[in-house]
Structures are given as structure tokens and as C-alpha cells.
């Protein structure tokens, strides 16, 4: 069936996932030649163009999809990412609200009887509930702006992933930090307004624009920082550099962010430093490969649960001189505690 537009679009998705971006775009164009009003093909093409670094062309493709299908939530969400990457903050954050209408997220939105805060209602004397969405790293990132909410109210509760409770409690003593609990959402009466954390930025665009890089906002236990400094000194001489080369979440979409270990040679071969692993999953074989390939040891503290004990991970990061990492929770924590952090952005 040579005029099967959907097959060409599906082929494009498969080619894109294999990193064959030019071939993927050619497949999408074939689909559109057959079916010019094919919104999904335009949106898929936008993703491939984005992966090529062609942000303006990607934005144009998403807008074509939306001209055909104005309520296409996935295209709105994809558009939001490219607008934000293009520093079009206000437009991008408005489009980001469409995330709740996508197939992936529609079931995860919490349903309360209390109203969503619109950014305009006076919060003086009122209590607001902020609730986490998506991953641990997102929660850490968004928590950097909690002081903006605290400038409007003295009564703020944040419900987050359980393993973040100790670290965020230590860092934000004026916020009630609790593990998320969705069991009785519709019956709750312990707050006046609520808001998902991903909507926080939208209501503070002027403040964020003036201060795009907030100061250290995470506060690990000073006793644990001192403990980890002594542990580091037992390994050898500094500077002590923490490294993390992959995430536990490696989907086809995220795979381009994570380079093979061979690409890390400029870091692993720095002379006169002590390297420390900040990996939290599937890394023991990697440590052996690094030793065999580069003749260097990346030290790992086996008694530290990097995945769950984030309070101690933050303390270790604070004790380090530098962190080099790919996109994951690690650089958000290390930058959050004020340690110089370099992000290895392979996709770009």
C-alpha cells in the first residue's frame, strides 16, 4: 500500500529512535505528501528537527501540527520544550500547561476539591499545597524556587518523593515537607489552594528572569559533610571530582544524552585528581571498564545508597571540589548544594 501515510510516519519514528534523523524527516515528508493535514507527522518531524538542533524549524513544525489540530496536547507539550530552549520563557511555560492533557499525564494529575492557585489570589494567611510531579530531579530543580512562594505566604506544604523528605526538610525549615500521599485527595481540607510544582515557574517569570541561577538552596547536614570530607581525604590527594555518566532512565528519547565511556577520556585522564563515582545504578561493570581502559580508579563508597539516601548524597557532593555529570538528578543536587558543577551535554 504505497499511499499509506501512517506507515511512513511510523517508519519515521523508528528511524528517529535509531538516530537516523535525516531518513526520519524524509519519511515524515512522504507521509505529509500523501496526507497534508497529518498533524501527528508534523509533530513527529518537530521532534526529529529538535534532535538535529534546529529549534526554529522544530517550532514551525509543531505550529503546523497545531494549525491542523489545535487541541493536540502532545504537540503543545513538545512546542513548550523548544520555546523554553529558545529562551521564550513566558510562551514556553504557558504551553507547558498542556502536559496535563497528554495521554501520558492525564491520569497522574491530582484531583482536589480545593482550587488550583492561579498566581493572582492573595495567599496572605492562606495555606498552599505544592505537590511533586515527574521525577526526583524535577522536584529538586523546582524546589529552588520555594522562597518565591514563601514570600507570599507563611503556610506552605510540599508533598514530594519520600526519599527527598529528609534533605528538603533540612533545606527548607519554613516549609512543611511530607511524603506524597494520594489516597484521599478528593476529601482533603487541610489547605486553601494547591499547585503542581511544574507550574511554579509560570507565576514568577520576572523574578526568575532576573535571577536565572539561584544561589545554593540545598542544605546538607554539616556533620555529614565533615564525615564525607574525611572519607575523601582517606582516598588520596585532592582535588576531588565527582563523576556521573548515565541515568537510570535511558529511554530512546533520552539516549542521546549519554555518551559511551570512551567519550569520557578527557575527564578520566585528568592528572593529579581523585575521582569519585556518583552513579546510583548499574555501574560496577563500568568501574572495571574504566580501570582497564584508562588505568584509573573511580572510587565508589559501597556503604552509601546513592539511589535512596539523597541526604547523604548531597553531603558528599558538598564535600567535593567539582562534579561532572550528564543530565540526571546528580547535577541538580550538586549544583543545589553550591558545588561547581559541569554538565556534559552530549546532545548539543
Regions found by a protein language model. Name each.
Residues 1-348:
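Alpha-helical solenoid repeat scaffolds of the TPR/TPR-like class and their adjacent stem/linker regions
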